């Protein structure tokens, strides 16, 4: 179920304050956050936000295409190593 429009998008308060503070600067700074549930808003466009995946911070460069998505979508928490190889393939 989607979030109600009247509530607006969720974004952590401290992250929002950092985004507003860095949008006025000339030099771009990487913003670190643990908030994977925060929604990407238009004020974040052209910023680099490092999202924690449980082990390390993954840098995400925000473009207009990413607006409306969650930050956690772009920092995977699991590593897919592939399915087990079948030994029965060559036997007969």
Swiss-Prot record:
GO cellular component: cytoplasm; small ribosomal subunit
rRNA-binding listed as a keyword: yes
Example of a GO biological process term: translation
A GO molecular-function annotation: rRNA binding
Cross-referenced InterPro entries: Ribosomal_uS19, Ribosomal_uS19_bac-type, Ribosomal_uS19_CS, Ribosomal_uS19_SF
UniProt key word Iron: no
Keyword annotations from UniProtKB, A to Z: Ribonucleoprotein, Ribosomal protein, RNA-binding, rRNA-binding
Record Pfam families: Ribosomal_S19
The protein's role, per its UniProt record: Protein S19 forms a complex with S13 that binds strongly to the 16S ribosomal RNA.
Family, as annotated: Belongs to the universal ribosomal protein uS19 family.
Name of the molecule in the record: Small ribosomal subunit protein uS19
Source organism per UniProt: Borrelia turicatae (strain 91E135)
């Amino acid at each position: 179920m989607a979030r109600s429009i009247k509530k607006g998008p969720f974004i952590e308060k401290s992250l929002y304050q950092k985004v507003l503070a860095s949008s006025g600067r000339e030099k771009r700074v990487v913003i670190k956050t643990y908030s994977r549930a925060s929604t990407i808003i238009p004020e974040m466009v052209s910023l680099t936000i490092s999202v924690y995946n449980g082990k390390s911070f993954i840098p995400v460069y925000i473009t207009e295409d990413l607006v409306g998505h969650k930050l956690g979508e772009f920092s995977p928490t699991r590593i897919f190593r592939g399915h087990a190889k079948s030994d029965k393939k060559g036997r007969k």
